[in-house]
Amino acid sequence: MRSRIPITVLTAGALVLGVAACSGGAEGSGGPDAATPGTVQTAPEQHETTVARATGDGVAVFADADDTEPVLAVPGTSTFGFRQAFLVLDESGDSLHVLVPGRPNGSTGWIRRADVELQTVDHEVEVDLGARTLTLRSGDDVVLETTVAVGAPDAPTPTGRFFVTDLLETGDPNDDYGPYAIGLSGYSKELTEFAGGDGQIGIHGTNEPASIGQAVSHGCVRVPNDVITTLATTVPVGTPVTIH
């Protein structure tokens, strides 16, 4: 994306969008990934996903279920003010094995059930970079499928298992991001900062519809504006997104 722009959180007030971009012409910087408890790359075969949402100011993350000293503290809200989400992979007693938002992509750890509220989502998004398609499913049903723009060769869209962290409205279909942007839990491997943001990737609309189907972004997935409108008003925070 070219610049920081005013946006509206779909359930809160005005903030600023700074996810890693999908328009050309801006510079970013690379850097090493931070250390984290573990990684996961593949999605389980299931139609309903359990999501843990933070209930307090922060969530302690542990390397193992029985550990007493956390290795990471995750803020209770995302950059854009949404209650922090974690994708639940497994559970053991009072602990939950989760996919953690942030670098490096695919990081996992254990959190305490007492620190979160559990929810379920039945939608999932799949992005096929080779075919340049995005598919939204609800259970076994395909809700929509569309052609997308993906990351350019020097800033490819990262692959892996992610989830929705933020749902943002720009208020302008002619904006660089189109009318909506969806923040994801993943980050660009090439850009540690971009347009005032920290290299977070997302799915958003565009004011350059001719770019759809091309490899032209700085890592985000760019979709037609009618599609991003459907996505942003359909999928909740925590919805799993698999990019391959």
Q: What are the roles of these predicted feature ranges?
A:
Residues 23-26:
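Bacterial signal peptide processing site
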Residues 78-114:
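SH3/SH3-like beta-barrel superfamily modules
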